[in-house]
UniProtKB/Swiss-Prot annotation:
This is Protein cft1. It is found in: Nucleus. Keywords: mRNA processing, Nucleus, RNA-binding. Residues 436-446 have a biased composition (Low complexity). Pfam families: Beta-prop_RSE1_1st (PF10433), CPSF_A (PF03178). RNA-binding component of the cleavage and polyadenylation factor (CPF) complex, which plays a key role in polyadenylation-dependent pre-mRNA 3'-end formation and cooperates with cleavage factors including the CFIA complex and NAB4/CFIB. Involved in poly(A) site recognition. May be involved in coupling transcription termination and mRNA 3'-end formation. GO terms for molecular function: RNA binding. Gene3D superfamilies: YVTN repeat-like/Quinoprotein amine dehydrogenase. Belongs to the CFT1 family. Residues 436-455 are annotated as: Disordered.
Length: 1339
């Protein structure tokens, strides 16, 4: 019984789409990251905050940033997205058609009332009658293509081997081609004057129940009998009827059979008659190059389509005229098609992405698989294309895109987005000067043309007419001028693809962390020259600058004060030390080079309890709110002595101070110009209310009302949230039902509100970075739950349209133990205006942590490492870090340089400049050893006696192979301190750190780095391998670089026949086992450096994974053909014995053990993104006396796994609390192991064993959530996960992504679901904490 939890969602961008989605005039970017759908808006910001990314020549320009609006975890894998303009949408913008794996389509729109997606329809094409042919390929093994007509008249979805689904869309009137539904898709050029009124469109929409007509499925052979092997298709521009071009072949293309199947590709243009469900072939072009793989439709002024091949580009216009250019010397050898020769460019077009970057000309930006950009220009002769030219982009293009692009989107105004699965995705742009340069080459349309010619000029830009004098050079010159100002607007960072992971000792300078055994997860990320080390942690682990003892202190505040004499700003830290239950002493420290105590006799002389400390009067006065008085640093305002009310909550924003007293009344003070405080007279409506909490918000951006207004949020005892504008105290809005915690807070009370949460504090705070900070409403409950709401307006920012959308927060607070309960009372939330460049909020207490948000991410909670945090405060300058108070004392700390706060885990990246395939950590030397590779040219060996003709090979465009090397990285500076190159064409297949026996006499054991390599020189030559044994030794360092005191020393080298594909430590005598060729051999290291074989096992195929259950001798062998083998190793005598096999022949990519009590499970990841749980149970009758591994369950993750690693599991807070309260020994029920799964798309998952009782509760909860929740895009989580289990003893794996959505429900819905499940809410919360990653307590 296991549960799969996705700790980090997929990060690699697979698809991108530019569309006006939130409104008709919006500029949005929709990004798909495998199963994560994100909706961004483009926001222009001034360059005053951007000094690092923009060059001085562009200081007068604005830059553009991506701001995340919403994101959705989809129970499905996105395969394509396209935009569709339908009759009527809720937002007025376009709709989006999303294609999923297994032939599903969802039509979605934006709903401004809910500020989220609304599913219009979902279309399934996976029925048996669609693929009932017994020899047809399975849908999961076939690709799919989605394309929409530019006029939004229909969309086509090619799925399976040769099936085509056509979905017609209703359009206004009988004529489908109208001005506002024209063939030009660019929303920035949409015609303003519509020929029909909006009322007429609404009338047309009312005539149809759905925006689409009935779809139908045809085989491709029904359109053209010769379409046997489809390659690519796309709808074309400038056709009155829906028309698409399809690239196909009648026989399968093959590079190996090129001499027989040369130029066998066809290109056909087919127009559709949607009413008659018929088609007509307009033109067909034959004998095209066999390496063509993609069709790109080109808008005016070029028109037609661009066919992309591995070695050439081919343009075909509307009349079937072809123009081609070859970009390497193989274009002539691979094809006889007529083309222009540009073979001197030596470009490789595999996996390239092409996108236009301007509306003024037809030039295209080509992103190659290496990250290099090239410019594709068309020679226009009037309306006809007479030639193509390609020009590589000179300059540091690697700074823009580090590796292969996977998708692209043109966003208008000189902005192009390139998504990547193997590097950061980038938003590129050009300066306005370059746009003017390009426009200078465009001619103007003469005024005496006819109306028909004017309409054609809308389709065909007049730019080519001005280029006819020098058609070859002018487009290139304008484009080169444009590229001179190329720059990066924004990035979407990605820690994927994750190729390998290792655990290492934390590199932070914190001595107590080392004692606590804090580790960090280091991953090898990126491809090609974008290789990077990523350091990940679950919690904020700050760098301690200074510490001091403060045993009796229980609260902390930080203030930055501006002296009256305009002297330099000074930062202070104020501690409160409790003397008695109602008395405390305040100590003041000034922050200089270190904390220096100062004498402040007037500061809290009566030793009252402090409620809040802040500044007013433009930071010239320090205000201290005590229980019975409010004090300024030189002026005091005292309450009436006869008034025994005391302050319990305070909030302040210049020049106001609001205090909630113990009788739930409000006291409002205002500071005058001199800093003195005066009481503000309140209206009777405010005085008569009983208030629970108050919070000020300075609306500098004018989100709620006029800019620079002060907004006061008040929560009363009926859980109504009043929003007031000061100084006139006008009511902006009254939000109902706050205590019910519904998904959307509004002025309407919730329908079912019998159950409420006890909300103790509210806070409205800006969250974000320097590019985008937005206000959020934070609610803190009595259980330390933080509920985050995002405000939005439903109708043009009218006050009645103010609503709050609940953001997902799946971090559960820790259950306090006995020690924590003895700590001081609940500390209020602390607003942090600037911490590491981000505005944030901090929650003290046993579950202390921050809520961070970046412009491209949603708010998320990250804990601060440590125990009970009593208080934390930051300073005005982020360079000074922050101060916090815990049980160890007072600390000044900073976040490590380069820390990324945009993910649920803390991350830092260390660029290496080469692709990192493997990495390992050496604890003895505290270093990391990397196995990197770089591309190098490959020549056939000239000394081969069997092939003397290879010596006569004449080729300049050589193939490339990987050449590996080893690098030593010091975590002190995260720099490479040593390197060891391997032979040419030698590639590292596996690398691990092992404790090996180095002496047969003394039996001494030391940590060694064992490397297995493969030396492949081509298909005709058998591969060889080698086993290297290295040790990291200590040497004399460079005096200026003390971290260079480590070097690699080669201890042994053992060449073997066959590639070394897997390694593992085995047994208890310091031996290793290596998979070499088709054998797995146990070897021991001798003193002379040789590796002596002692036992072996014959394998049928090349082994991809070997794992040993440490110290037991039990190991697994896995490969992609013969499945998984479970074997054992004995030392007396040395022997390998086969125990059991997987008879299902799984395609094993990665695997590891998962012990659960007295049960032994094996987790296997296959090539179809599935996880299998196998069990070795010889007592089960189905195991054939233990010869068969039992397949207990199957679970579809949707992520292509790269590693599966067994890790120890720590107890979560609820388990520790139960073990502490119950004197019985119940630790046996808590699982002690878990498996971490990393993927190529950057996601990280966790497989956790679940006890029987918890499994029953969670399984019932999952069933309830599957049936009751509204799933995005209308998908079915049960069908997506495709859970299969052994009916006799197996249990299906649980889906934590679905289970954790229970936390996002309202209080009433939680109580109802818990009642149906038959459990209490506390039991469900404890179960969810156990599966949500809390067992990784050492990270």
């Amino acid at each position: 019984m296991q549960c799969y939890t996705e700790l980090i969602s997929p990060t690699g961008v697979t698809h991108a789409l530019a569309v006006p989605f939130l409104s008709a005039t919006a500029n949005n970017l929709i990004v798909a990251r495998t199963s994560l759908l994100q909706i961004f808006s483009l926001r222009d910001v001034s360059l005053s905050a951007l000094d690092t990314e923009v060059r001085p020549a562009q200081h007068r320009q604005e830059t553009c940033k991506l701001v995340l609006e919403r994101e959705y975890q989809l129970p499905g894998t996105v395969t394509d997205i396209c935009r569709v303009k339908i009759l009527k949408t809720k937002s007025g913008g376009d709709a989006v058609l999303v294609a999923f794996r297994d032939a599903k389509l969802s039509l979605v729109e934006w709903d401004p009332e809910r500020y989220g997606l609304s599913t219009i329809s979902i279309h399934y094409y996976e029925r048996d009658d669609m693929t009932r042919s017994p020899w047809a390929s399975d849908l999961s093994t076939c690709g799919s293509i989605l394309s929409a007509d530019p006029g939004s008249r229909c969309a086509i979805f090619q799925f399976g081997a040769r099936s085509l689904a056509i979905i017609p869309f209703h359009q206004p009137g009988d004529d489908l081609v109208m001005d506002d539904f024209g063939s030009e898709p660019d929303y920035e050029n949409r015609v303003e004057g519509n020929s029909r009124s909006h009322e007429a469109k609404d009338k047309d929409a009312a005539e149809y129940q759905t925006p689409y007509a009935s779809s139908f499925v045809l085989p491709l052979t029904a359109l053209d009998p010769s379409v046997i092997h489809p390659i690519s298709l796309a709808f074309l521009y400038e056709y009155r009827e829906p028309t698409f071009g399809i690239l196909y072949s009648q026989v399968a293309t093959s590079h190996a059979l090129l001499h027989e199947r040369k130029d066998v590709v066809f290109y056909t243009v087919i127009t559709l008659d949607l009413e008659q469900r018929a088609s007509t072939t307009l033109l067909s072009v034959t004998r095209l190059p066999s390496d063509l793989f993609k069709v790109v439709a080109l808008p005016p002024p070029v028109g037609g389509s661009l066919l992309i091949g591995s070695n050439e580009l081919v343009h075909i216009d509307q009349a079937g005229k072809t123009n081609a250019v070859g970009v390497n010397e193989f274009s002539r050898q691979a094809s006889s098609f007529s083309m222009t020769d540009q073979s001197d460019l030596a470009l490789r077009l595999e996996n390239c992405v092409v996108e236009r970057f301007s509306d003024d000309n037809g030039d295209l930006l080509l992103a190659l698989s290496t990250g290099v950009f090239a410019l594709v220009s068309f020679k226009l002769d009037g309306r006809s294309v007479s030639g193509i030219s390609v020009r590589p982009l000179s300059g540091p293009s690697k700074e823009f895109l580090a590796s292969t692009a996977s998708s692209s989107a043109f966003l208008g105004n000189g902005k192009v987005f390139f998504g990547s699965e193997s590097a950061d995705s980038v938003l590129l742009g050009w300066s306005s000067a370059s746009s003017a340069t390009k426009k200078s080459f465009s001619g103007s349309t003469s005024n005496d043309e006819s109306e028909d010619d004017a309409y054609e000029d809308d389709l065909y830009s007049s730019a080519p007419a001005a280029m006819t004098d020098n058609p070859q050079n002018q487009p290139s010159n304008s484009s080169v001028a444009a590229f001179g100002d190329l720059r990066i607007h924004d990035r979407l960072s990605s820690p994927g693809p994750i190729r390998d992971i290792v655990l290492g000792r934390s590199s932070e300078a914190s001595s107590r962390d080392t004692k606590d055994g804090v580790l960090e997860l280091v991953a090898a990320q990126g491809s090609d020259e974008g290789g990077t080390m990523v350091i990940m942690k679950r919690e904020v682990d700050p760098y301690l600058v200074a510490s001091m003892a403060a045993d009796t202190a229980n609260s902390l505040w930080t203030v930055s004060l501006l002296p009256d004499n305009n002297d330099q700003k000074r930062d202070y830290v104020i501690l409160s030390k409790q003397e008695k239950p109602d008395k405390e002493e305040s100590e003041v420290f000034v922050l200089e080079d270190k904390l220096r105590p100062i004498t402040a006799p007037e500061f809290n002389p009566n030793h009252e309890l402090t409620v809040e400390i802040g500044t007013l009067a433009s930071k010239s006065r320090v205000i201290q709110v005590l229980r019975n008085e409010v004090r300024s640093y030189d002026a005091v305002w005292d309450e009436d002595d006869s008034d025994e009310r005391v302050a319990v909550n305070a909030t302040l924003v210049d020049p106001y101070l609001a205090i909630i007293r113990d009788d739930s009344t409000l006291l409002l003070l205002q500071a005058d110009d001199s800093g003195d405080l005066d009481e503000v007279t309140l209206s009777e409506d405010v005085v008569s209310q009983k208030w629970l909490s108050a919070c000020f918000y300075s609306d500098n951006a004018g989100f709620f009302t006029a800019p620079f207004a002060s907004i006061l949020f008040l929560l009363n005892q009926d859980h109504q949230l009043y929003v007031y504008r000061l100084p006139d105290f006008a009511v902006i809005s009254v939000i109902e039902g706050v205590g019910c915690l519904p998904p959307i807070l509004s002025t309407e009370p919730p329908k079912r509100s019998t159950t409420r949460e006890n909300v103790l504090q509210i806070a409205v705070v800006e969250l974000g970075d320097s590019y985008s900070s937005l206000p959020f409403l934070i609610l803190r409950t009595e259980n330390d739950d933080l509920v985050v709401y995002k405000p939005f307006f439903t109708n043009s920012k009218e006050l009645t349209g103010l609503r709050f959308l609940k953001e997902a927060n799946h971090t559960l607070p820790k259950t306090p133990n006995t020690t924590d309960e003895l700590q001081s009372e609940m500390k209020p939330l602390r607003i942090l205006p600037n911490i590491a460049g981000c505005s944030s909020i901090f929650m003290p207490g046993p579950s202390a942590g921050f809520i961070f948000r970046a412009s491209t991410t949603s708010p998320h909670f990250i804990r601060l490492r440590g125990g009970f945090i009593k208080g934390l405060g930051c300073f005005d300058s982020p360079d000074k870090g922050f101060a916090y108070l815990d049980s160890h004392g007072l600390h000044l700390a900073k976040l490590p340089e380069g820390t990324q706060l945009g993910y649920p885990w803390i991350m830092r990246t260390v660029p290496i400049g080469q692709q990192i395939d493997k990495l390992t950590y050496v604890s003895a030397s505290d270093t990391y050893v990397l196995g990197t590779c770089q591309r190098c040219e490959f020549r056939l060996p000239e000394d081969d006696e069997l092939h003397p003709e290879w010596r006569n090979e004449e080729i300049s465009f050589l193939p490339e192979v990987n050449q590996s090397s080893l690098k030593v990285v010091s975590p002190k500076t995260w720099s490479v301190i040593d390197s060891y190159p391997l032979e040419p064409a030698e590639h590292i297949m596996v690398m691990k750190t092992m404790s090996l026996e180095v002496s047969e006499n003394t039996h001494e054991r030391r940590d060694m780095i064992v490397v297995g390599t493969s030396l492949a020189r081509g298909e005709d030559i058998p591969s060889r391998g080698c086993i290297y044994v290295f040790e990291v030794i200590e040497v004399v360092p460079d005096p200026e670089q003390p971290e260079t005191n480590r070097r690699l020393k080669l201890i042994g080298k053992e060449p073997v026949k066959g590639a070394v594909t897997a390694l593992s430590e085995i047994g208890g005598q310091g031996f290793l086992i290596a998979a070499q060729g088709q054998k797995s051999m146990v070897r021991g290291l001798k003193e002379d450096g040789s590796l002596l074989p002692v036992a072996f096992m014959d394998m049928q195929c090349f082994v991809s994974v070997i794992k040993e259950l440490k110290g037991t001798g039990m190991c697994i062998f896995g490969d992609a053909v013969k499945g998984l083998w479970f074997a054992g190793y004995s030392e007396e005598p040395y022997k390998m014995s086969l125990f059991a096999k997987d008879l299902d022949y799984l395609e094993v990519l990665a695997a590891d053990f998962l012990p659960d009590g007295n049960k032994l499970f094996i987790v296997v990841a296959d090539s179809d993104c599935n996880l299998y749980v196998l069990q070795y149970d010889p007592e089960d009758p189905n195991s054939s006396n233990g010869d068969k591994l039992l397949n207990r369950s199957k679970f579809h993750t949707g992520n292509f796994a790269s590693t599966v690693t067994l890790l120890p599991r720590t107890l979560v807070s609820s388990e520790r609390a139960m073990s502490g309260s119950d004197k019985m020994d119940i630790d046996n029920t808590a699982p002690l192991h878990q498996v971490l799964v990393t993927s190529h798309n950057g996601s990280i998952g966790l497989v956790t064993c679940v006890p029987e009782e918890s499994y029953r509760r969670l399984s019932a909860l999952q069933s309830q959530l599957t049936n009751t929740l509204e799933h995005p895009c209308g998908l079915n989580p049960r069908a997506y996960r495709a859970v299969e289990s052994d009916a006799s003893a197996g249990r299906g794996m649980l889906d934590s992504n679905l289970l954790l959505q229970y936390l996002d429900m309202s209080k009433q819905r939680k109580a109802e679901i818990a009642g149906r499940v038959g459990a209490t809410e506390w039991e469900i919360r404890a179960d969810l904490e156990a599966i949500s990653g809390g067992g990784l307590g050492y990270l």
